Regions:
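Feature marking well-ordered beta-strand scaffolds used for ligand recognition
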Residues: 20-416, 431-437, 451, 476, ...
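Generic cytosolic/nucleocytoplasmic N-terminal low-complexity/intrinsically disordered segments
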Residues: 2-3, 477, 482-483, 527
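Sec-dependent signal peptide recognition
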Residues: 3-9
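C-terminal motif of bacterial Sec signal peptides marking the signal peptidase cleavage site
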Residues: 15-18
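Extracellular beta-strand solenoid repeats
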Residues: 419-421, 427, 438, 444, ...
């Protein structure tokens, strides 16, 4: 159901005093109209599984359409695309994502001079079935970044103050009430305006809200409670901020990184001579005793926090080939347990291992769209991918309890074309990407395994899985076939983008009480085959 809320600014509302008369707080609304949508039948078609499934990684030694390394060995990082969430309309592009609890909060803007934006809330509590629960569309304002905190979304962006009676300046922040995944009380929105062409980043810190607002803008500090102005500091060209403990890092495109203390005094400066591009957001991230900086065409700069020394440049890998040099820019960085993710615009999403002070480029993830922003939490990566919207990626790392059970098994390091001969009995652990599996003997796999092509358990063979098995893609379906007299035992998750065929005399057995079968194709079971055990049939195919 659509609700159109007329936006009438209350002129006598909460005028904040400050060192700048540009910084003003308004209780009520911003532009001519805001449109909300909470109807699941309208929202859910935004979620697409059309290209869900196994994601390849184009590796450093052989970038290209086949996605293979030179030796065709099994790859690490068995990633899978869970789903895509398309933008609310064809003009909008995903700009930022924040993940908190069971929900992801996604912002959208327009890349040209037109002002338009949106925010969506996505329920990710069921990793197999994400759902858009609520949406708010700003018809005359960009939303460039956001953060959820304690029942509110704090969103920042830009509006054309020349044509909006409600906006004393282009750069704004909105505090929007959220209840159980819904935007349900837009009359309670509070707005603040600060100097700068457009606000580009926001961070909740203790009981304050920090906002950066680009060229000729500021670092503005608001009260979290009611957006009362606390302080404002002018900077030439702020692009983003990052906070760890009481350390605050600012990226100023005119100079480099400034590290502030809790009183917003500069305690350290890192000079960076990089062309960050005009009016484009670039993020930075604390990591151990270093700071990672998105440096546009240069990739990611790694700097020492203690003395500001440049320690490393992590380059931009390109796949597919032929991407325009102007589209090869690092826009954002994120880290997760020793893995650096770089949002490289048209050059895609790249992965680099960063441990013990060294870096090793893994490759480029097989994704569509220009990657504007990346966030990672738990076992997931969330990529804001321009016109492709939000892409939800599962890392499929084995659970700690599973790792313990698999600890006595050797890690698999062989070919990505996995074959077991008649009479052979093999058992491996790992988190690997494979081309295919042909099993004619006895095979135990423990861990997480993604398979680009088919899995065939030949006549009278045995295959046991303890962990996660993902096969195929929804736009390139592949089958699992359990042939005559064969047995397939599963303790964990089987995610199949294709058909499951259980032939005469074959057995499919689910062990334990929490196994999952998520089959996107058909399940074909011979009348003399056996399926037993307790499991969750996600798509009702059995």
């Amino acid at each position: 159901m659509l609700k159109k809320i007329p936006l009438v600014v209350v002129a006598v509302s909460l005028l904040a005093t400050s060192c700048s008369d540009q910084t003003t707080i308004y209780q009520d609304n911003l532009t001519d109209t805001v449109v909300t949508e909470n109807d699941a039948t309208v929202l859910q078609p935004s979620v697409s599984f059309s290209v869900a499934g196994v994601l390849d990684i184009y590796e450093d030694d052989a970038p290209g359409a086949n996605g293979k390394g030179a030796a065709d060995t099994a790859g690490n990082y068995p990633l899978s695309l869970v789903a895509q969430v398309s933008p609310p309309n064809s003009l909008l592009t995903a700009s930022h994502v924040d993940v908190e609890g069971d929900f992801a909060y996604v912002s959208y803007n327009v890349v040209n001079e037109t002002f338009s934006g949106a925010i969506e809330i996505i329920n990710i509590s069921n990793p197999h079935d994400p759902r858009v629960t609520s949406r708010v569309v700003y018809r005359n304002a960009d939303i460039n970044a956001l953060q959820y905190h304690n029942g509110h979304v704090y969103a920042v962006g830009g509006v054309d103050a020349m044509i909006s009676d409600a906006a004393p300046s282009n750069s704004f922040i909105a505090k929007i009430p959220v209840n159980a995944g819904d935007f349900s009380n837009l009359s309670g929105i509070i707005y603040g305006f600060q100097q700068g062409f457009t606000a580009n980043d926001v961070f909740i810190h203790n009981d304050e809200v920090l906002v950066t607002s680009g060229k000729d803008g500021s670092l503005t500090v608001y009260s979290q409670n009611d957006l009362t102005l606390q302080d404002e500091f002018m900077y030439a060209d702020l692009r983003s901020l990052s906070i760890r403990g009481e350390e605050i890092a600012l990226l100023d495109a005119s100079q480099g990184v400034k590290v502030l203390d809790k009183k917003y005094k500069t305690v350290r400066e890192i000079n960076i001579n990089t062309d960050f591009g005009p009016s484009t957001k670039k993020t930075l991230k604390f990591h151990d005793d270093r700071i990672m900086v998105s440096e546009a065409a240069k990739g990611t700069g790694v700097y020492s926090l203690s003395d500001g020394a440049l320690l490393d440049y992590i380059p931009i890998m390109v796949d597919p080939e032929g991407v325009s040099p102007g589209d090869q820019v690092t826009n954002a960085v994120a880290t997760n347990d020793g893995l650096l993710m770089m949002a490289n615009g048209g050059a895609g999403l790249s992965l680099t291992e960063i441990e013990n002070g060294s870096s090793k480029v893994v490759g480029v993830v097989e994704l569509r769209g220009s990657i504007n922003y990346v966030a990672s939490k738990g076992d997931y990566i969330f990529a804001a991918s321009g016109s492709e919207g939000l892409q939800i990626i599962k890392m499929n790392r084995p659970a700690e309890t599973l790792v313990d059970r698999c600890s006595d098994l050797p890690e698999y390091t062989g070919s990505d074309k996995f074959s077991v001969n008649v009479g052979e009995s093999v058992a491996y652990s790992g988190a690997k990407r494979l081309n295919h599996i042909v099993n004619k003997g006895a095979l135990l796999l423990c861990g997480s395994w993604s398979i680009r092509n088919a899995v065939s358990i030949e006549a009278d063979a045995l295959m046991e899985l303890n962990g996660v098995l993902i096969v195929g893609r929804n736009n390139g379906r592949k089958d699992i076939t359990v042939k005559k007299g064969a047995t397939f035992k599963i303790e964990g998750d089987m995610i199949l983008y294709g058909n499951l065929k259980v032939e005469e005399g074959a057995t499919l057995e689910f062990l334990g009480d929490s196994s999952v079968a998520n089959v996107f194709g058909d399940v074909v079971i011979h009348e003399n085959a056996t399926v037993k055990g307790n499991f969750e049939d996600v798509r009702g195919k059995f």
